[in-house]
């Protein structure tokens, strides 16, 4: 599995995340993916071949292994990390869409040179407006995926600890046989570590949702007490209604000025208009 590609995608989201979101990403890649790739995969690498039952009955080992380990720990954690990391891509797509709109506005304003476009790509987008909702929804989905996988893991392996010996009487085993699990202590340590890291991520997600809501409420209260001035720059200002209205007024004034210049340069047309206005006043 190529975890480097996933890290490259999420590192772009990290630039636009909160401080808690950056900590969450560090926990994901340092304490979970690195441990999963470096250590856990080697510990669980021989789980099927080293699962031995004291019987020579063909198929008994495979049936007992499937009964006690319906899904491998490593594969379950890999699926969990992929699904938990996917909602963050919503934020990356939203930011890319906003930057695309800003680049189009710069081109319409005549600032479409590569320097300005590269500056748009580098600057940090503030979490506000529709981006705030996208960010909160992504964090909530991360939280739900983490909690769901914790519950699924509890249903599959209630004790969390890896047992050394299991007794199996499933068909085609001739009777109740003893089956031995390889490296039970190592597997227990890594299981507890991964579950603890998942619990930390759940706490970070809850803290980030609370932080985003509190900060949004504080900003709204600040706007009510101190109305924002019309001056400003940046992406949010360019998309504000005041900015759009000012641009429209500017275009209208330029068109009005050009029309007056045309009337000045055409005396006949100006005289005709003056004559029409005199007739209207006489009427």
Curated annotation (Swiss-Prot):
Function as written in the Swiss-Prot or TrEMBL entry: One gap junction consists of a cluster of closely packed pairs of transmembrane channels, the connexons, through which materials of low MW diffuse from one cell to a neighboring cell.
InterPro entries: Connexin, Connexin32, Connexin_CCC, Connexin_CS, Connexin_N, Connexin_N_sf
Keyword Cell membrane: yes
Assigned GO CC terms: connexin complex; cytoplasm
GO molecular function, one term: identical protein binding
Protein name: Gap junction beta-1 protein
Keywords, comma-separated and alphabetical: Cell junction, Cell membrane, Gap junction, Membrane, Phosphoprotein, Transmembrane, Transmembrane helix
GO terms of biological process kind: cell-cell signaling
Organism from which the protein derives: Equus caballus
Protein's UniProt keywords contain Ligase: no
Entry superkingdom: Eukaryota
Ranges annotated as spanning the membrane: 23-45, 76-95, 131-153, 192-214
Compartment(s) of residence: Cell membrane; Cell junction, Gap junction
Bilayer topology: Multi-pass membrane protein
Family: Belongs to the connexin family. Beta-type (group I) subfamily.
Extracellular side: 46-75, 154-191
Ranges of the Cytoplasmic topological domain: 1-22, 96-130, 215-283
Positions of modified residues (Phosphoserine): 233, 258, 266, 277
Self-association and partners: A connexon is composed of a hexamer of connexins. Interacts with CNST.
């Amino acid at each position: 599995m190529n975890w480097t590609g996933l890290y490259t995608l999420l590192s772009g989201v990290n630039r636009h995340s909160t401080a808690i979101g950056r900590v969450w990403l560090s926990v994901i890649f340092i304490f979970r993916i690195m441990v999963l790739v470096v250590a856990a995969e080697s510990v669980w690498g021989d789980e099927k071949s080293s699962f031995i039952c004291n019987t020579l009955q063909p198929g008994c080992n495979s049936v007992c292994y499937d009964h006690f380990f319906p899904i491998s720990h490593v594969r379950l954690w890999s699926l969990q990390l992929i699904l938990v990391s996917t909602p963050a891509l919503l934020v990356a797509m939203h930011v890319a869409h906003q930057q695309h709109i800003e680049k189009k506005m710069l081109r319409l304003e005549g600032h479409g040179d590569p320097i300005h476009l590269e500056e748009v790509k580098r600057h940090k987008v503030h979490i506000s407006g529709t981006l705030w909702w996208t960010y909160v929804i992504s964090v909530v989905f991360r939280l739900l995926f983490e909690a769901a996988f914790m519950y699924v893991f509890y249903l599959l392996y209630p004790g969390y600890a890896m047992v050394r010996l299991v007794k199996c009487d499933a068909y085609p085993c001739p009777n109740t046989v003893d089956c031995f699990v390889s490296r039970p202590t190592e597997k227990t340590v890594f299981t507890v570590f991964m579950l603890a890291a998942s619990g930390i991520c759940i706490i970070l997600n809850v803290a980030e949702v609370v932080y985003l809501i509190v900060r949004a409420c504080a900003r709204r209260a600040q706007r009510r007490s101190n109305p924002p001035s019309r001056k400003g720059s940046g992406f949010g200002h360019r998309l504000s209604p005041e900015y759009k209205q000012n641009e429209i007024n500017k275009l209208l004034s330029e068109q009005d000025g050009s029309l007056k210049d045309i009337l000045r340069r055409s005396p006949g047309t100006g005289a005709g208009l003056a004559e029409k206005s005199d007739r209207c006043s006489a009427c």
